[in-house]
Amino acid sequence: MPVRRGHVAPQNTFLDTIIRKFEGQSRKFIIANARVENCAVIYCNDGFCELCGYSRAEVMQRPCTCDFLHGPRTQRRAAAQIAQALLGAEERKVEIAFYRKDGSCFLCLVDVVPVKNEDGAVIMFILNFEVVMEKDMVGSPAHDTNHRGPPTSWLAPGRAKTFRLKLPALLALTARESSVRSGGAGGAGAPGAVVVDVDLTPAAPSSESLALDEVTAMDNHVAGLGPAEERRALVGPGSPPRSAPGQLPSPRAHSLNPDASGSSCSLARTRSRESCASVRRASSADDIEAMRAGVLPPPPRHASTGAMHPLRSGLLNSTSDSDLVRYRTISKIPQITLNFVDLKGDPFLASPTSDREIIAPKIKERTHNVTEKVTQVLSLGADVLPEYKLQAPRIHRWTILHYSPFKAVWDWLILLLVIYTAVFTPYSAAFLLKETEEGPPATECGYACQPLAVVDLIVDIMFIVDILINFRTTYVNANEEVVSHPGRIAVHYFKGWFLIDMVAAIPFDLLIFGSGSEELIGLLKTARLLRLVRVARKLDRYSEYGAAVLFLLMCTFALIAHWLACIWYAIGNMEQPHMDSRIGWLHNLGDQIGKPYNSSGLGGPSIKDKYVTALYFTFSSLTSVGFGNVSPNTNSEKIFSICVMLIGSLMYASIFGNVSAIIQRLYSGTARYHTQMLRVREFIRFHQIPNPLRQRLEEYFQHAWSYTNGIDMNAVLKGFPECLQADICLHLNRSLLQHCKPFRGATKGCLRALAMKFKTTHAPPGDTLVHAGDLLTALYFISRGSIEILRGDVVVAILGKNDIFGEPLNLYARPGKSNGDVRALTYCDLHKIHRDDLLEVLDMYPEFSDHFWSSLEITFNLRDTNMIPGSPGSTELEGGFSRQRKRKLSFRRRTDKDTEQPGEVSALGPGRAGAGPSSRGRPGGPWGESPSSGPSSPESSEDEGPGRSSSPLRLVPFSSPRPPGEPPGGEPLMEDCEKSSDTCNPLSGAFSGVSNIFSFWGDSRGRQYQELPRCPAPTPSLLNIPLSSPGRRPRGDVESRLDALQRQLNRLETRLSADMATVLQLLQRQMTLVPPAYSAVTTPGPGPTSTSPLLPVSPLPTLTLDSLSQVSQFMACEELPPGAPELPQEGPTRRLSLPGQLGALTSQPLHRHGSDPGS
């Protein structure tokens, strides 16, 4: 296999880095997007969920100011500081009191930290929460002077709020008040100054707090000013009188909506119950002066909403140095503004009190770097905060990538040096040491007499350099990440091959030089053979090619023979001087070649003769082909020969006897890899895939192959029985099924069935899993990595491990479309299950179904509620059987949650097309049909809604709120029916279409809408009559008609049993079968027996017509399915009007309902 490169594709490791830094510190934090409205929360960790008691699904997309944690003791000043911190680009800490979901209060230290992208702009905020103390331990609220008063939900009518702001810096400015006020007319407002404009009630003065403009809010008090005494006490003598607050222009409105010059929005001194909190800048120096004095500046005499006062405009646009110097001290004032403005006049600025938005104007460019203080606070180490972008793995300076070309060349060089060491180290230790002792000393001729010593010295130097390079070479950890940190590389190398490499690189001949013990040097030199371990650990890199495998096998055989030849010569050389009888193999060799040893032991064959003869003996012994010309004679030689024969037989049998088997075994996975890779490259070449896409394709294939090792799990599982397959799938998905809350409590059989349906998906960084507009056919569970969800270019959520995304399958009978793109930030592993498979399993285990849907919390709902899935082209996406099964399942699993979600249609009643904007004001419905006619297709009538059932519904009084004078829409009214009821037949409708009485409540045109987004009124749970265009009938008239219809239906129920009994009697006595209306067989004439049963029924039509006078009118207006043929306008009709006499009924066959294909 190729070199394991690890995860080298650019990844967005923002979430992983934050979690890794915080996981050991018990941090509680959320991440918010600074580029969306309200700085919505896009991620929260488990610690924050445990702290506040809310689940992750409840926190996502909420404002990061945590308004849902506010309570009676939450300080307004602290909340305003958090809001202002979100406007800037610097870190800030705020201490604030929050409330958990259970109502308990705690004091929390919030640390707001900005996060930048590659351009240096702040795109996100990290809010870290640290619990200081539980609020229950604090004293009574009377001592909490900075705590916020009760909100609207806890505040009794007429009770005002108290807001005291600690501004000690204002005390130092009192001495300069006159100078600043004198220059207020021509100066400019300080850039950092703000105005505090709040509703206050009189409170006890404090040495450190400043009561600002305390007034009482009254709903019917237009002026909004408190008593004159209070104003004089606050403003002081000499202050100019205030004019009506309605004359004060709103600079905030102009800054937010420059085009709305004609807006009538103005600042008000009082705060009504519908007003909202906002943040605004100071518009002039007068505002700053008034803030110091505790009042607002006097408004201009001629205020205009179309343009600002010239003086204000001049002050805003002034940038002179004198103005900045004049007000340099005002920047010390905390930048906090609470401006309660009555915005009811401008719908663009209107906001409900329950959802307080933070409107963040551009104060300054958010390009400040994260300070070192932030790094220390969050304990992020040297990495500071990661940037939110796709970035390649960070490589430290002077670090070598383990897959770089330089490293590859260096490894080949080291391999050659290792081979040299493996060959010459045993040779020099066995053959050359004796010659060195007999030759001249090295001190006289130096390295000129020993050329191999120079080479050995160079090899030792290269090995030492290789050790240094290994300290700077990256590696791949267990998480498939490339590690480039020098410290971690050193620790990894110390734990691995450092000891072996160090021992093999020690130059023992230099350390023991001059000691005279050449035998010891020769033995220590054999430690260099440990370098062969480097070759052994890299053999798998070259074992995928057949030629390389054969070459390595032959080299291994020759190297072992070389080592054995050196040992064979060492044995004979050791025994030769001490042997009296000349029987050793060296003596025999000398006698054979004519170079015998003399009596002193000198002479004999040359080194070349000795080595070649020894190598010849070992090869012949290893291959079991001994010719006997070189034979062992001494006991030592014979024992060694036995060992060589054993080794030879083992090598011969295992290598040469099974070369083909070894190659096939080594090539089994490699051959499949290259075959598949060849197919991929042929596909790329044939379709001319562009370069970037080609690289992504090859990179994914290589990583997927290394991830699965080329194993096709489906092919492997197919060879096992289903019970074993279920056990294997249960083991592979055990982490998800054991730790995911919705699967807890499921039986073993249910878990096995679910495990069989799950599929594992592996996604590289940058890969898009779901595109905007794609059908949501599966539910995804993240098991590793992190993903981001984008709407356009805006990140709306970041999901990590154990998060779930998709759509709530139990609320919709048909798959919806995605409202955003889902893109992987890192290498991700996801478990997905298709909606059909999940619904099928839950259908088999209905006792587990309710628990699953109630405990399933989808972290992010991808369903696009702004689109209408029930379009004509979407009918072909599902088969008839799956539609019926999904409709049945959706009915059985309906919950009351449908009525609580605006924009979703109730799943219990068949008529769920509410009077939304999409169905109102357009004649003819969504497909251009008239209100009183226009057929619709049977497919759309069956499964257009989230839940559709053919079973009759029990009728309940209609209580959905409707505008006055607006009748129920979707069905024509009675006078419309009278105008177009030429073909209406009450009798045939009563007999052959009793179900039409109930289908009146479920309009076919209403079922074309699966959901209505942003519906202002909740949808009824059981009965939802669609609303038509407004102004056609008053509400009282419609309700009276509904009551009359209810009474008629009650009468019908009393006669239904008798009528059905009569019909059954007619069918039983009919002797001949009546063919279908669309059949080619002619209907035989009625026999004489067919007229007698009809005589007793003569009074029945009259009674039925009387009892169904109004019902028939509604039935006549009901639309036919689009697949049914239209009724003929001329000629005989199948539905007889029967204007009072029943004689014709005896000669006419029974007719079918209008929905029958032949009617």
Swiss-Prot record:
* Phenotype for F656C: In LQT2; uncertain significance
**What keywords sit in the KW lines?**
Cell membrane, Coiled coil, Deafness, Disease variant, Glycoprotein, Ion channel, Ion transport, Long QT syndrome, Membrane, Methylation, Phosphoprotein, Potassium, Potassium channel, Potassium transport, Short QT syndrome, Transmembrane, Transmembrane helix, Transport, Voltage-gated channel
Q: Topological domains (Cytoplasmic): residue ranges?
A: 1-403, 472-495, 542-547, 660-1159
User: Where do the PAC domain residues begin and end?
Assistant: 92-144
Principal subcellular localization: membrane
User: Intramembrane segments at which residues?
Assistant: 612-632
SMART domains referenced in this protein's UniProt entry, alphabetically? cNMP (SM00100), PAC (SM00086)
Give the result of G572R, as annotated: In LQT2; severe form
Segments on the Extracellular side according to the record's topology features = 425-450, 517-520, 569-611, 633-638
State the post-translational modifications.
Phosphorylated on serine and threonine residues. Phosphorylation by PKA inhibits ion conduction.
Mutation: Y43C; reported impact is: In LQT2; uncertain significance
Task: Provide the tissue specificity.
Answer: Highly expressed in heart and brain. Isoforms USO are frequently overexpressed in cancer cells.
Name the reported effect of N629I. Answer: In LQT2; uncertain significance
Coiled-coil regions listed in the entry:
1035-1062
* Outcome when changing V644L: In LQT2; uncertain significance
Complexes and interactors: The potassium channel is probably composed of a homo- or heterotetrameric complex of pore-forming alpha subunits that can associate with modulating beta subunits. Interacts with DNAJB12 and DNAJB14; chaperones DNAJB12 and DNAJB14 promote tetramerization. Heteromultimer with KCNH6/ERG2 and KCNH7/ERG3. Interacts with ALG10B. Forms a stable complex with KCNE1 or KCNE2, and that this heteromultimerization regulates inward rectifier potassium channel activity. Interacts with CANX. The core-glycosylated, but not the fully glycosylated form interacts with RNF207.
Q: This chain belongs to which protein, by name?
A: Voltage-gated inwardly rectifying potassium channel KCNH2
Identify the species of origin: Homo sapiens
Question: What's the gene?
Answer: KCNH2
